[in-house]
Amino acid sequence: YNEAMRRLSLFIALSVLVASHLAQASETNSGHAMTMYDTEPVKYGENFSHFDYLNPNAPKGGGIRLGAVGTFDSFNTFIAKGNAAGTGSVETLITSSADEPFTVYGLIAASFEWPNDRSWVIFNLRSQARWHDGTPVTADDVVWSFDTLMEKGAPGYRYYYSAVESAEKLGEHRVRFNFKEAGNRELPLIMGQLPVLPKHYWADRDFTETTLEPPLGSGPYRIKEFEAGRYIVQERVPDYWGKNLAVNRGMNNLDTIRTDYYRDATSIRLALKAGDIDLRSENQSKAWAEDYNVEAVEKGLLKKEMVPHQMPTGMQGFVFNTRRGIFKDPQVREALGYAFDFEWSNRTLFNGQYTRTASYFSN
């Protein structure tokens, strides 16, 4: 009798545990935003008007001229072939806020659904989303984009989405991604970053080939003119479907964005000082210290400014091949680190622009 009762009690306890686990796994969350962890607070509520760091009344107009190193022979950025130039015409299902660690809000998607175990995610698309030719963006486009990138896209897509079992159309504006395993908390957010491409546009075009035909997109900009390998001019789409979304309010203010291509960074610096481009983000300490001592800076015509930020900057250091006997001893590696004269290098080679790396997560 005691043995039977013990087994019955154990069976009941296991049943309750399994039922509790299944209930927790099947519990569905939904909302206008999604975070890495469901316990994280969302800064912007369902009816927010704009991101705090943007000016919703920012004036629109004008243009900017930028410089890029290299060249281009294609606008198909989704394959390995060719040297493609990106455009502002492709959108994703979600967009991230810049003042939260990893919280996403809907762009093409209006809302999301996901279980506690994150074994799948559903995106409910905005019915007003449109391609530049006026055709609605639908679940067919999302499913086709995923399947095509997995089958014909650059190899990186197959690796990036390798944990996804399938993309499934649930309705005209509703799509679900099923995952091979539960528990990957980032995967639903990753799928929101899927570039959404127009199925009808590619129906009679070869996705695996390079092309200089300006692509059809749904985003705030489209290509106005270009010269292969030389420059691209993008224009703001006046009737862009998403211009009044809260996530876009205060953004996409320029009428035109021109990008000129140069042989190297030195050529871009010369173009900036000559007034041929408007902006450059400098990443070389020597150039920052020495290359901008020009009259235009002294007169205030060219502004040189260091912009504080709180973004992790990564780390720099020595990487040792510990398969070699000489580097297997931790004390040897530590001694080589001490032997490196950081202060002299920083003063002599880097114009005093660097600080010591104290963490893998600097800044």
What are these regions (language model features)?
Residues F11-S20:
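Bacterial N-terminal signal peptides
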Residues S166-K169, K224-E235, D260-R324, A335, ...:
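Extracellular/periplasmic solute-recognition and catalytic clefts
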